[in-house]
A protein has these predicted regions:
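Hydrophobic, aromatic-enriched alpha-helical segments typical of multi-pass transmembrane helices
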Residues: 2-234
């Protein structure tokens, strides 16, 4: 490899490593958020109590959600980069859903930060305000579909990774089970939620490691036929 080729490959390596790290970090941050979350459910009384008694945890959860949402962009970017032919359409859909889901988590983080201003006001008024905010039709029509997109996004990302030979069937099948479980298990079961997020971290962390260990030739936009990624066996 000459000096020019080596210099040109450096930005591509940075992009690869950023994508790999983001695939691991975005679900790991959600594990932290779920373990600390003092405001599960988001009702007026819950938000007021959390902002009064555990404002630090509320800030930590907000930051975790917002950074997790931001990291969805480089995370799906790594998958999109590898979807050249096989699985390209599914990966494109996964990218769109994943980024929209990231917006949803960013919105929840902002909601948590806004709740920090609740203490100090008249309690019933503050509780009623959050209730009205939750019941706002425009909010429901915009934010809740974005939150739904996150679950659909991680599901599509896992199947897209399988289609592009980055992971074995255990990954998308497990993620599918997690998403379905999240829909059928009642809210307010933190241990189950944390366990599900840990599994997502394992799956997407594996994908991150897999992408991080690709050679420059495998990561190149147009690899030679003999440099195409070998299918995942695990």
């Amino acid at each position: 490899m000459n000096t020019a080729d080596h210099t040109a490959s450096f930005p591509h390596r940075i992009r690869r490593y950023a994508s790999a790290a983001s695939l691991l970090a975005f679900p790991a941050l959600l594990v932290v958020e779920a373990a600390l979350d003092p405001a599960a459910g988001g009702t007026g009384q819950v938000m007021l109590t959390a902002a009064t008694n555990r404002p630090g945890a509320l800030v930590a959860c907000a930051v975790s959600l917002m950074f997790s949402g931001i990291l969805m962009v480089p995370a799906v970017g790594g998958l999109l980069h590898q979807a050249r032919d096989r699985g390209a359409a599914l990966t494109t859909l996964a990218g769109a859903l994943g980024v929209l889901g990231g917006f949803g988590h960013f919105a929840i983080g902002m909601f948590y930060l806004v709740a920090l201003a609740l203490p100090g006001g008249e309690q019933n008024e503050m509780v009623a305000y959050v209730g009205r905010l939750n019941d706002t039709p425009a909010l429901g029509a915009i934010v809740f579909p974005l939150i739904l997109c996150f679950g659909l996004g991680v599901l599509a990302m896992a199947w897209a990774a399988w289609r592009t030979c980055l992971i074995g069937l255990w990954g998308p099948i497990g993620v599918t089970a997690v998403v379905v479980l999240h829909e059928v298990v009642p809210t307010g079961t933190p241990l189950i939620e944390i366990a599900a997020l840990v599994f997502l971290t394992v799956v997407f962390g594996y994908l991150g490691i897999r992408i991080g260990r690709l050679s420059d030739a495998e990561w190149a936009p147009n690899p030679q036929a003999h440099e195409v990624i070998a299918p995942a066996t695990a």
